[in-house]
Amino acid sequence: MGGLRLNAIAIDEVRDIFGADEGLAMKLRRWAEARFSVPVHHHRRPRWRSPFHPLYKPNVECSMLPTGWPTPHDVEDLVCGRYIESDRSARCWRLVNEWLTHLSWGWTEIPMSVARFEELDRDLAAAGLPSTYSLKRLMDEDPQIPLRPAPGMKIGYAGTRQILATWVELSEVIGTVPIARRGEVNAVLKFLSSYPGWNHLAVDLGRPAPGLLVVWQPDTVEDAHPTGLRAGRTAS
């Protein structure tokens, strides 16, 4: 099915990940190690001699990474702002999603196919939502980050003004959306309703006002959670 992930964070704070300063880079590496570290496995190899090979050592230590697991090389390339090849982008997005759970004011993941996303906008239009405030408009802007979408993935960004206006307009029409189709819209609306509070906190903490980074991931991308809603909040 895939999943729609909403991240409340200023776009400049997202861009700061790529080519991070020393303080942020230290945090990113620590979060990556805590989430993606794997134990060292001990493999016993037979002792045999060959005219072409040296004597094999009986115990060789190596890290066995699960398929699709990000590597230390991926971490360093992202932190240093280096180019990421397309065949590495899916696992690098696993890293970025993990970092966003720590850096964002809040985040949520909503199980949703592309077809369902488009259907929701049709439902909302029928309920009277102006097209200016459709869900698709929350993905209108290009985040302009070095890490491009993995195959099948879609990303977009919306600024604070668009977010708050969409929240107001959604609040006015949600009651006329059929109850059977209201779950995903309610999840989006609940998330957007937190923005006024986050904006006040941002001023108090000297951080930029949060925007909205939207990531739609197909079910082939790891860390999409199609089985249920997930959400979290931070204010660090």
Task: Describe the role of every protein-language-model region.
Residues 1-208, 217-236:
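Acidic (Asp/Glu-rich) sequence patches and key acidic residues
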